[in-house]
Amino acid sequence: MAEQISSAKAEARTVRIAPRKARLVIDLIRGKSVAEALAILEFTPRAASPIVEKVLRSAIANAEHNYDLESANLYVSEAYVNEGATLKRFRPRAKGMASPINKRTSHVVVVVSEKND
């Protein structure tokens, strides 16, 4: 018989926030219950918070809808940010010069799993 699936995943790819900044927020929720993680994200004043919150809510919805998991029993088992494509731009400087500007993007991944009590 097939093994029961007990985790669900959600990804946001090519999000316009630097991975270094997104990792500060992702590190706060790893290992927490989903209710606690949502509360943390709601009150964290960082630009990455709404993005990570949206991905977390998507992972919870995937768990409930696709795998019939109970949201009260879920916790954030994996949460990480990988580097996406970098948009390269130039800022004009004095005397006809230009400085490079790297607009970094991120791939945000959140996996929620059922607690084994």
From Swiss-Prot:
The keyword Chloroplast does not apply. Pfam families: Ribosomal_L22 (PF00237). GO terms for molecular function: rRNA binding; structural constituent of ribosome. The keyword Nucleotide-binding does not apply. Signal peptide: none annotated. GO terms for cellular component: cytosolic large ribosomal subunit. Gene3D superfamilies: Ribosomal protein L22/L17. GO terms for biological process: translation. Keywords: Ribonucleoprotein, Ribosomal protein, RNA-binding, rRNA-binding. This protein binds specifically to 23S rRNA; its binding is stimulated by other ribosomal proteins, e.g. L4, L17, and L20. It is important during the early stages of 50S assembly. It makes multiple contacts with different domains of the 23S rRNA in the assembled 50S subunit and ribosome. The globular domain of the protein is located near the polypeptide exit tunnel on the outside of the subunit, while an extended beta-hairpin is found that lines the wall of the exit tunnel in the center of the 70S ribosome. Part of the 50S ribosomal subunit. HAMAP family: Ribosomal_uL22_B (MF_01331_B). Belongs to the universal ribosomal protein uL22 family. This is Large ribosomal subunit protein uL22.
